[in-house]
Amino acid sequence: MLVVHSKQELEEHLAEWRRQGDHVALVPTMGNLHVGHLSLVQLAREHAERVVVSIFVNPTQFGESEDFDQYPRTLERDTLRLKKSAADLIFAPDVETIYPFGLKDATTVSVPRITENFCGASRPGHFDGVTSVVARLFALVQPDLAVFGQKDYQQQLVIRHMSLDLNLPVAIITGATIREEDGLAMSSRNQYLSESERSTAPVLYEVLSAAGEELQNGGRDFAKLESESVTKLKDAGFDVDYFSIRRAQNLEIPDRDCDELVVLVAAVLGDARLIDNTVITI
C-alpha cells in the first residue's frame, strides 16, 4: 500500500492505474479510523479495482468553537490499519495542497436548502466546508465512485446533490452504519465519552429504533413521536439538538402517505455530539 502527500505523487500513481484500465474508488476520511471506516473501504473494493483513502482533517468544516484542534491525528495508526484492508493508496495532503490560495481566499462550494436544517443549522458553515473539500478531492483523485457512510445521512444527500448539480462524473455509494455491540453507531468522537457517558450512549439508538418501529407499524403522528423521543433522551441525560422524521430522499416534511422516511437525531452527551439515523421503507 502506498502513502502519498503531494498532488504530483498522487497523479503519477493514478495515471498508471488509468493506463491499466482500472476503476478508482475514493473513501474520504478525516482519519482516526475505526471499523466503520474500514467497512467503507471494503465496499469501495467491491466496486473498483483501486481504492484511495484520503486522510485530511478539513479546517473549513469546523466552527470556531468546535473540536478542530482536539480532533485526533492518527496517521501512523491509520496506516497500519489500512495496510490490512483493501486500500491501495492513502492520500494524506497538507492544507496547502487542498487550499492552494489559503483558507481566506478559497473557493466555496455551497449547496442550498438541504443544508439549511439539522446539522446545517446547528453547525453554520459546516456543509460548505464539506462540499468544498469533497469537490477538491474529486478534482484531485478523479474517482469513478466515492463511498460515504449512512451515519452522516444529511452529508451524503448533500454530496449527491452537489455531484448531480455540477455534473461530476462520480457515482456516490452509501455504506451501512456500523455499530458497537450495544447499538451505538461507531464514530471517531465516541472517544470523547467518559465511562459513565459511554454506558448511557446506547440509549440514543434505543430511542431511535423505537421510533422507527412505531413508524414501521403504521404510526403517523410524527409530531407526537418526535416529542416523546426528545423527552426520553432528555430524561437519559442528553442535550437534544434535533429529533426529526423526514422524507428520506430530500429531508422535506413528509405527509402521512410517504413510504420512505428517515428518522434523524443529534444529541450531545458530555463533550460528544452524537448523530444517528434510521431509514424506514413501508
Regions found by a protein language model. Name each.
Residues 2-238, 246, 250:
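Nucleotidyltransferase catalytic core that binds NTPs
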Residues 227-282:
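Phosphate/ribose-recognition catalytic cores of enzymes acting on nucleotide-derived substrates
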